[in-house]
C-alpha cells in the first residue's frame, strides 16, 4: 500500500485533498464508530489507522499534519443543554484532529473496537509521534468538546492517558454532553 500511495503522490495526487462527504462504501465502519470523515485528508486517515509509516510518507510529500475533519450537520440536540462552556463550532468548522483520531475517537460507542483496523499496539507510538515530532496540540477539543484523553479513556488505554496527563491535559475537561474522564 505504501508503494501505491507513493506512486499516486509522485503522479501528482493532492496530498491535502479533503473528503467532501463520508464515503458510501465505508458506512458500516462509520455507523459503528460514529465518526463522520467529511473533511478528512489522507494524513488524518493514516493517523486514525495509527500508521506512522504512511504518515511519514505523506509528510514527505507536503501533507498538513494538523488538518481536522469538518463539522457536518448532526442530530438536533436542542433539548440537551451544553454544560461545557465551549464556544459553538459552526458547520464546516474544525471537528476531529489527527491527534484525536489517533487517540481513539469513536471507540467508546457500541462494538466499534471490533470493526476498525489499525496498527497493533500502535496507539501510544502514534500519539507520541503526532505530539513530539509534529507538535500536535494536546489540548485540542473536538466539535463535541472531547479531548484526546476522553477517547483514550473510552478505550481504557492507561498508557495514552498517563502520557497525555504528563503533557498537561486536564482530565476534568467536560464534553458538550457533560462527560469528563473522571466521572
Regions found by a protein language model. Give the residues of each.
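Leucine-rich solenoid repeat scaffolds
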Residues: 171-183
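Solvent-exposed, polar/charged alpha-helical surfaces in well-ordered, non-transmembrane soluble domains
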Residues: 3-6, 44, 53-56, 100, ...
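Ankyrin repeat domain, specifically the short helix-to-loop turn at the C-terminus of the second helix
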Residues: 6-14, 56-64, 128-137, 162-170
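Ankyrin repeat A-helix N-terminal signature
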Residues: 1, 28-38, 45-51, 78-80, ...
Amino acid at each position: 500500500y505504501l508503494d501505491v500511495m507513493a506512486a499516486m503522490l509522485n503522479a501528482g495526487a493532492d496530498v491535502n485533498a479533503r473528503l467532501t462527504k463520508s464515503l458510501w462504501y465505508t458506512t458500516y465502519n462509520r455507523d459503528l464508530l460514529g465518526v463522520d470523515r467529511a473533511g478528512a485528508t489522507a494524513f488524518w486517515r493514516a493517523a486514525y489507522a495509527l500508521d506512522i509509516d504512511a504518515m511519514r510518507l505523506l509528510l514527505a510529500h507536503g501533507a498538513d499534519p494538523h488538518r481536522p475533519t469538518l463539522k457536518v450537520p448532526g442530530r438536533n440536540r436542542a433539548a440537551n443543554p451544553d454544560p461545557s462552556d465551549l464556544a459553538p463550532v459552526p458547520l464546516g468548522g474544525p471537528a476531529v484532529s489527527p491527534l484525536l483520531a489517533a487517540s481513539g475517537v469513536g471507540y467508546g460507542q457500541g462494538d466499534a473496537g471490533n470493526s476498525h483496523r489499525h496498527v497493533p499496539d500502535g496507539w501510544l507510538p502514534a500519539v507520541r509521534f503526532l505530539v513530539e515530532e509534529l507538535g500536535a496540540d494536546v489540548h485540542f477539543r473536538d466539535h463535541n468538546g472531547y479531548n484526546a484523553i476522553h477517547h483514550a479513556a473510552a478505550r481504557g488505554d492507561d498508557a495514552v492517558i498517563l502520557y497525555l496527563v504528563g503533557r498537561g491535559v486536564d482530565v476534568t475537561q467536560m464534553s458538550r454532553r457533560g462527560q469528563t474522564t473522571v466521572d
